C-alpha cells in the first residue's frame, strides 16, 4: 500500500511539473510574440516601397484608379483584400512613410506565427519544440522578403486565414473544447487517433475565412486544399466540399468576370516537368531552411515523407499535418503555373508559405525523435536557441541589405522630384527602373504635388547626373515633340542589321543570347521600334554594346506593335538590349 501511495505521489509531482513546463512554454511563446513585433518593425524602419506595390500606391494617391478596380487582377491574382489594406493605410497615414504599411504587414505575420503555434500544438508537438520553431519562424531569415515587402501580404495573409480556418474545422470535430491538449491531441503524440466527424455549426466562419483567403492572392487559392482535407478526414467528401465550395465558386465567378485575361496568361513554357521541378525545389529549399545545403533539405524531406507514411499506416497522423503538407505542394504548383518565366522556387516570399506549411509535420517528427532518444530538456532548449539565433542573424543581415537598396531607390525618386521641376523631363520616363520601375516621371510630379515625395535641398552630383539622363529618356507610344535630327544606329553586338523600306533597318539576333544596338542622338529625337516577334526591349544609358549599364526603361512589345524611344537631351547615346526576337528600327 505504501509503495502504491508513493508511486501516486511521484506521478502527481511529475504531472504537475509537466503542466508547469507547458505553462512556461506558453508564456515564453507569448513573450516572443510581444518582443518580436517591435524588433521586426525596428529592423525595417528605413525600408520603402518597391516593385509592383508602387502600382497600388499610385492608385490610392490619385493616379486615376476607380473604386471597382480593387476587383481587377493584380498581376494575375485576385488581391482585393491586399489592395484594400493598402488603400486603408494610405487613407489614414498617407504614403510619405513605409512604416504604417509595414506595421500592418508585420502584425499579420505575428498573428500567422501564433496560429501556426496553435496548429503545432493541435498536432501533438511538444510545447517547447513548438515554441522554439515558431520563434525561429517569427524571425525567419529565409523569408525576409515576406516580412519586409508589404506586398507579400499575398502570402502571409492567406496563410493566417487558412490556418485559422483549419483550426476551426479541426476544433469542431473535438467537441468545441478549447485550451490545452485535447484527448485526441494526447494520442497524437503517441498512438492511434480517433477521427470524430466535423460538426456543421462552425462551417460559416470557415467559409468566411476561405473567401478572404482567395481574395488575398494566389496562395490563398492553393491553400483551399487544407480545410478541404481536414473536412474530408473529419466528415467525408460532402463535408469537405461544403467547407471550400463557396470560396471556390466565388473565385471561379471572379475568374470568369474580372480575370478573363488570366486565361490567356502564357504560364510556364516548359510543361509539366518544369512545374514538378519548381515544386521539388520549393519543398527541398523549405526543408533546408534550418539545415543548410539543399542536399540536406532533400534528405530531410524524404525522411519526413517516410515518417508521415508510417504514422498514416498506423492511423496516428493528425489530419492537419498531411493537409498542410499537401497545401505546400499546391502553393508551389500554382505558383509555377502562374509564372511565365518559370521563376525561382527558392525566392524568399515563396519559401515563407512552404516553411510554414511543412512545420507541423517537422515539429511532430522532432517531438517523436526527442521522446525516443530521451534527450534532456536543456539540450533541446539549447538546440532550439541556436536555431532561433541563426534565423534572426540572417534576417538582420537581409534587412540591412534591403534597407540599403530601398534608400538608394528613394534617393533617386527624390532627385527626380527635384530635377523634374524645370518642365523638360519626359512624362513617360522612369527615374528609377530597378525597384521603382512602375513609377514614371509624371507619377513623381504627382507625388511631389501631394507631398509624398518632398524634393531635397541639395543633390549628390553623381545621383543628379544619373537621374537627369533618365528623366530625359522614355519609351512611349508617342514621338517626342520638337524632334530634330534623326538618331543613328551606330553599332550592333550579337546580331545583324539589314536594310528595310522607308530608310529602316531590321535588327536580328545571330545567337540565342539576344543582341544590343547602339543608337546615337545628336539632337533631341525619337527612334521608332517595331517588334517583328514578341520582344522585351530594354534601354540603357551611357553603355557600350559589350557592357550596357544604367538601365533607363524596359517594355514588352507585342508582334506588330511599336514604341518610340525618345531622348530629350542632345548627345545622348543609348543601348537597346533585345533578349529575344527581332525589331525594325526607323527614324
Predicted regions and their residues:
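Intrinsically disordered, polar/acidic, low-complexity terminal segments
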Residues: 6, 17, 23-69, 73-76, ...
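Aromatic- and kink-enriched transmembrane "portal" helix at the membrane-lumen/periplasm boundary
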Residues: 80, 98, 102, 132-159
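Transmembrane-helix signature of polytopic, membrane-embedded enzymes
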Residues: 116, 120-140, 160, 179, ...
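Specific aromatic-rich, kink-prone transmembrane helix
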Residues: 133, 154-176, 357-361
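Hydrophobic/aromatic-rich transmembrane helices and adjacent perimembrane loops
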Residues: 147, 155, 343-369
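Membrane-interface transmembrane helices that cradle and orient dolichyl/undecaprenyl
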Residues: 162-203
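Perimembrane helix-loop-helix junctions
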Residues: 192, 221-252
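Membrane-interface alpha helices of multi-pass inner-membrane proteins
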Residues: 202-217, 224-228
